[in-house]
Amino acid sequence: MKAVLALATLIGSTLASSCSSTALSCSNSANSDTCCSPEYGLVVLNMQWAPGYGPDNAFTLHGLWPDKCSGAYAPSGGCDSNRASSSIASVIKSKDSSLYNSMLTYWPSNQGNNNVFWSHEWSKHGTCVSTYDPDCYDNYEEGEDIVDYFQKAMDLRSQYNVYKAFSSNGITPGGTYTATEMQSAIESYFGAKAKIDCSSGTLSDVALYFYVRGRDTYVITDALSTGSCSGDVEYPTK
């Protein structure tokens, strides 16, 4: 692929902008060019419910994780050590202060250090989103891939509002509900099943699964498992 990209550069082609917008990742018709369809074509949006972190009426982000189509994980050490970074917070703040400020609200670390958290998410997961490889851009600017990755995760969190999915079905913080009720609320609101995880019977995470149409259009699909929640689940207030 890199040889093709090099040739495209020499002849002035705009390869990234010419990608097909119809092929769905993990399908037989998926584009073999990893700039046009992600190499790891099943992507997980994981959101947290952590009392004391983020707005009282919002799930916060844990990460956007590209996986193999089978559900197997991408490499645990990330996919491109040359693009790993330990200073993601400063990169985002300098490139897009609005995104940075939104991440402070909706992507806080529950361990107290946002930069360490974000740098981990980028280095382990962001570098595995092949469509954000610098070679895939027509006129790449340093840090553009980083901003695009985090902006996409933030956009998906906003578009797939789990708090609203629950509240629209009568599930609100401070109550106890069955795991089945929570699953049904997500499925009726988004049209797909979620992975819902608990810690000692208390809601902790909700994960939504996506395929990718073309380079950057995310299409929700059923999660590969229902998660660890079972029976009665506490949904605490923040």
Swiss-Prot record:
<dbReference type="GO" id="GO:0033897">
    <property type="term" value="F:ribonuclease T2 activity"/>
</dbReference>
<dbReference type="Pfam" id="PF00445">
    <property type="entry name" value="Ribonuclease_T2"/>
</dbReference>
<dbReference type="GO" id="GO:0006401">
    <property type="term" value="P:RNA catabolic process"/>
</dbReference>
<keyword id="KW-0732">Signal</keyword>
<protein>
    <recommendedName>
        <fullName>Ribonuclease Rh</fullName>
        <ecNumber>4.6.1.19</ecNumber>
    </recommendedName>
</protein>
<keyword id="KW-1015">Disulfide bond</keyword>
<keyword id="KW-0540">Nuclease</keyword>
<feature type="active site">
    <location>
        <position position="62"/>
    </location>
</feature>
<feature type="disulfide bond">
    <location>
        <begin position="198"/>
        <end position="229"/>
    </location>
</feature>
<dbReference type="InterPro" id="IPR018188">
    <property type="entry name" value="RNase_T2_His_AS_1"/>
</dbReference>
<keyword id="KW-0378">Hydrolase</keyword>
<feature type="active site">
    <location>
        <position position="125"/>
    </location>
</feature>
<feature type="signal peptide">
    <location>
        <begin position="1"/>
        <end position="16"/>
    </location>
</feature>
<feature type="active site">
    <location>
        <position position="121"/>
    </location>
</feature>
<feature type="disulfide bond">
    <location>
        <begin position="19"/>
        <end position="36"/>
    </location>
</feature>
<keyword id="KW-0456">Lyase</keyword>
<feature type="disulfide bond">
    <location>
        <begin position="79"/>
        <end position="128"/>
    </location>
</feature>
<comment type="similarity">
    <text>Belongs to the RNase T2 family.</text>
</comment>
<keyword id="KW-0255">Endonuclease</keyword>
<feature type="disulfide bond">
    <location>
        <begin position="26"/>
        <end position="69"/>
    </location>
</feature>
<dbReference type="GO" id="GO:0005576">
    <property type="term" value="C:extracellular region"/>
</dbReference>
<dbReference type="InterPro" id="IPR001568">
    <property type="entry name" value="RNase_T2-like"/>
</dbReference>
<dbReference type="GO" id="GO:0003723">
    <property type="term" value="F:RNA binding"/>
</dbReference>
<feature type="disulfide bond">
    <location>
        <begin position="35"/>
        <end position="136"/>
    </location>
</feature>
<dbReference type="InterPro" id="IPR033697">
    <property type="entry name" value="Ribonuclease_T2_eukaryotic"/>
</dbReference>
<dbReference type="InterPro" id="IPR033130">
    <property type="entry name" value="RNase_T2_His_AS_2"/>
</dbReference>
<dbReference type="InterPro" id="IPR036430">
    <property type="entry name" value="RNase_T2-like_sf"/>
</dbReference>
<comment type="function">
    <text>This is a base non-specific ribonuclease.</text>
</comment>
